[in-house]
Design a protein with these regions (language model features):
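A short, structured active-site edge motif that brings together acidic residues
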Residues: 112-124
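Active-site catalytic microenvironments for nucleophilic, acid-base chemistry
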Residues: 102-105, 126, 142, 165-169, ...
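Acidic, divalent-metal-coordinating active-site segment for phosphoryl/phosphodiester hydrolysis
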Residues: 153-164
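Conserved non-catalytic scaffold segment of RNase H-like nuclease domains
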Residues: 1-115, 129-150, 176
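Acidic two-metal-ion nuclease catalytic site recognized across multiple nuclease folds
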Residues: 162-242
Length: 242
């Protein structure tokens, strides 16, 4: 059975929830039959300051994102790179969910981003002992694969090498474990922030002496409503009040 062509994908994000968190880095490899044909790598502006724990986990800082494009500016180039290829990742459904949400909200109404996937986490769970940790960093250490964790392109490269290792070890005996499967994630297209919401948030921030740490124009309508509620309730407050 041929490995075929696929895009190895890894994202760094502001958190774990695709409905509320944002992509901050994309790393992808176009591969075929064990060879890397092309790469795609970019930072992405989330439109807001990073939380300290995000920087601690990813190593990505606000300064690194200062001149990064917003997702809308790289969406078409990314789509061209992805083509209709199978998506390969470690816990691929998580990255697929973030990517689908971002793409659906930037493309014309009716756009569908449906793909098949391969998951090194799923494959590892099938063949490795239960006591063996299955995080990407744990598996690369287990198989002695070079890896600089928590940066998108480095994680994509490590995932590719992990897949190649798993293929060499287990594909001949269990080829069914390496058959792509449909990825499923339901996402509702979001409504962009309304101008009156931006004005309202700016007024609330000014009244309370709170600095604006995000690009309000990048919010969705629901995000703007949540932000206004957080300001009113005191969840978000001026630095002098903390």
């Amino acid at each position: 059975m041929s490995r075929g062509k696929a895009v190895v994908l890894d994202l760094e994000t502001t958190g774990l929830n695709p409905r509320t968190d944002k992509i901050i880095e994309i790393g992808a490899l176009l591969v075929e039959d064990g060879e890397i044909l092309d790469t795609f790598s970019t930072f992405v502006s989330p439109g807001r300051k990073l939380l300290p724990q995000t920087t601690e986990i990813t190593g990505i800082t606000d300064e690194m994102l200062e001149h990064a494009p917003v997702f809308a500016d790289i969406a078409e180039k990314l789509l061209a790179f992805l083509g209709e290829h199978v998506l390969l990742g470690h816990s691929i459904i998580s990255d697929y969910a973030f990517l689908k949400k971002a793409l659906v909200n930037e493309q014309p109404k009716g756009f569908a981003f449906e793909r098949n996937g391969l998951d090194t986490l799923k494959i590892a769970r099938r063949f490795l002992p239960a006591e063996q940790k299955k995080a990407l960093s744990a598996l690369t250490a287990y198989f002695q694969i070079p890896h600089e964790p928590h940066r998108a392109l480095a994680d994509a490269q490590a995932t590719f090498l992990l897949y190649e290792t798993l293929w060499d070890l287990y594909e001949e005996g269990t080829p069914s474990a390496f058959i792509p499967f449909p990825l499923h994630y339901q996402i509702k297209r979001e409504v962009p922030v309304m101008p009156k919401q931006i004005e309202q948030i700016r007024r609330l921030l000014e009244e309370r002496g709170i600095p604006c740490d995000r690009d309000l124009s990048q919010l969705t309508k629901n995000e703007a409503s949540r932000l206004a509620d957080q300001i009113r309730s005191g969840v978000i407050k001026a630095p002098s009040d903390e």
